């Protein structure tokens, strides 16, 4: 039922990649799945409330009761050590193929937008009693997506999420300093240099 709901509201665009065309959806399907799995795996089941999914003209919203897991906040989402509130449930989700084995599903959520130069996922409305993810609708930046694809093909592997964050910020503001880029990835200037190589 959720897949039908999603498919009906998930517009598609195409990007030419050499002789091939790549479908790019408003909301990356893997990112959506990871966000939904995270909402169920990391919520506090002692609290009343539901996992909510809403797709509207502005974007996709997924929210769940309770705040982030202890030790995780909006500033370290991508850098905090992965650990869950419900490890048994997370393990079952991994075993049946719904969750990331690496415990880095949050990376997938960001990659779903960053790979195509689209607006970043936003957790800024999360509180101590609610985790709320907003993924804005946005057209892919075809030139940016091609540059990312070409670079990944050249190096023979996927770019890490920190590199994607840096490239996305440089696309937005080409005059960024290393210090500003360190703020973007919530890390050190040394890690910016490593991610940029």
Question: Where are the regions a protein language model picked out?
Answer:
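C-terminal regulatory or interaction extensions
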Residues: 1-197
């Amino acid at each position: 039922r959720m897949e039908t709901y999603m498919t009906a509201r998930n517009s598609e665009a195409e990007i030419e990649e050499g002789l091939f065309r790549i479908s790019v959806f408003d909301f990356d399907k893997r990112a959506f799945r990871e966000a939904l799995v995270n909402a169920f795996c990391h919520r506090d089941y002692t609290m009343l409330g539901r996992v909510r999914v809403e797709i509207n003209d502005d974007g996709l919203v997924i929210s769940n009761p309770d705040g982030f897991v202890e030790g995780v906040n909006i500033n370290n989402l991508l850098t905090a050590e992965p650990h869950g509130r419900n490890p048994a449930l997370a393990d079952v989700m991994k075993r049946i193929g719904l969750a990331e084995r690496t415990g880095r599903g949050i990376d997938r959520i960001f990659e779903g937008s960053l790979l195509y130069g689209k607006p970043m996922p936003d957790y800024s409305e999360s509180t101590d009693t609610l985790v709320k993810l907003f993924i804005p609708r946005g057209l892919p930046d075809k030139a940016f997506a091609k540059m990312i694809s070409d670079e990944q093909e050249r190096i023979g592997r996927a770019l890490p999420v920190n590199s994607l964050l840096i490239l996305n910020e440089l696309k937005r503001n080409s005059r960024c300093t290393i210090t500003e880029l360190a703020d973007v990835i919530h890390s050190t200037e040394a890690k910016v240099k490593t991610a940029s190589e």
